[in-house]
Amino acid sequence: MSVLEESLTSTVAFDVERIRRDFPVLQERVRGKELVYLDNAATTQKPLTVAYALQHYYTNENANIHRGVHLLSQQATFSYERARGRVGQFINAAEPGEIVFLRGATEAVNLVAHGYGRQHVGPGDEVIVSQMEHHSNIVPWQVLCEEKGATLRVAPIN
């Protein structure tokens, strides 16, 4: 179990310094202070375990999933489905098929707004986002509301 997984499943407080060690970029100092990275809506820093897993995949297993009968494709498919199952267990999904991997939060929000929203939001409906939302979670809902005659509401944060 990685330090991050251990921290996320533990009932004790985060050991922030231990977690920071998994992210080499966070060892950098900026203007004499420890680097703090909070722009996770744009991109998220990866812990070493993820970097190592990606390096292994791209150098040893790189192949299309669900697209081939050759060994590399079968191995990639197995790894992909195993990851889907583990994520599903971690978030208590009813079944692994509920887990959809996308490139990032922006793509995910667009998929929900354009897929679910176009089918279920109509004239007079209200879509609510919080005042804290990143731009990428506002624009798709603005566009959807304009197209469907719905109202976009912003919930204030105290």
Predicted regions and their residues:
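Pyridoxal 5′-phosphate
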Residues: 1-158
